[in-house]
Amino acid sequence: MKKTSNKVVLVGTGAVGMSFIYSAVNQGLAEEYVLIDVNTKAAEGNAIDIQDTMAVLDKPFTIKAGTYEDCKDADLIVITAGRPQRPGETRLELIADNSRIMKGIAEAIKASGFNGVTVIASNPCDVLTTVYQQVTGYDEHSVVGAGTTLDSARLRRLVAEKLNVAPKSVNAYIMGEHGDSSVAAYSKATVMGQPISKYLAEGKITEADLEECWTRAIRMAYEIIERKGATYYGIGVCLNAISSAILRDEKTTFMVGAKLNGEYGQKGFYTGVPVILGSKGWETIIEWDLSDAEKAAFKKSCDALDATYQKAKEAIA
């Protein structure tokens, strides 16, 4: 009999993970959810809390706290577990602790017999996605990093504010590391179908404005962490959008973490690039013809990620 429902397992029931689940149940992402956390009481409490929405929301679902055994027949696993980023700490400085955590999670999921798609948002996202895929040996297409989805959403909002248009009217994207070395691919940016260069030529936005938008986009997490200790709503909604594209086989373009195998002149690790998302994960990496400056910046970002991945391998050896 053909399966007619989707099962999603969340590993890590902190603020990011539960923001994703809250977004998911509100938008009817799946019919079954399982929460896994090293703190089983927290997982149980969160499951009960979400159960209290079942009589109000339109689309039916079940949710419970579970174990890695529940991964066996899951369609999608979303991993948000890990030590949180401290004020002033870069994502890459999280590497040793969270690499060891990710290795344990990967081994437990692999042992369950899971055969679906995994989406990873734990930081440093690009490196930990690479660690997970290497430890599990899963097909690289079935492992998806959150990549620069959130970074790009931030950039689109900031550029939209400068031009006084809706964020959805802006197609401007950030590539590379989900973090400080990322690259704003303005050469490919459009606003309401027009290249951003047209708005520059007309004086509606300046190069300084674009530089400010990019700088603020990559520093936004630090601004939020300084004020409230953590970021979670934005990434939670982004994770739901990524998950929806996978479960519904949308063939949508996203700036997620995909493993490079020669694309953009890089190889052997995950980073944020434009891809087509479908039911099997990321299907195709789209290679943009970047400007020379963007190519150089992307290479620099990839070099930093590769060096950090080598440190991650040492941490889990």
From Swiss-Prot:
One of its GO terms (molecular function) is L-lactate dehydrogenase activity. GO terms for cellular component: cytoplasm. Its main location: cytoplasm. GO terms for biological process: glycolytic process; lactate metabolic process. Substrate binds at residues 85, 91, 123-126, 151-154, 231. It holds the Pfam family Ldh_1_N. The keyword Electron transport does not apply. Pathway: Fermentation; pyruvate fermentation to lactate; (S)-lactate from pyruvate: step 1/1. NAD(+) binds at residues 16, 37, 68, 121-123. CDD domains: HicDH_like (cd05291). The active site is at 178 (proton acceptor). It is found in: Cytoplasm. Its EC number is 1.1.1.27. The modification Phosphotyrosine is found at residue 222. InterPro entries: L-lactate/malate_DH, L-lactate_DH, L-lactate_DH_AS, Lactate/malate_DH_C, Lactate/malate_DH_N, Lactate_DH/Glyco_Ohase_4_C, NAD(P)-bd_dom_sf. Keywords: Cytoplasm, NAD, Oxidoreductase, Phosphoprotein. It catalyses: (S)-lactate + NAD(+) = pyruvate + NADH + H(+). The keyword Zinc-finger does not apply. Belongs to the LDH/MDH superfamily. LDH family. Homotetramer. Catalyzes the conversion of lactate to pyruvate. This is L-lactate dehydrogenase. The lineage of its organism: Bacteria, Bacillati, Mycoplasmatota, Mollicutes, Entomoplasmatales. The gene is ldh.
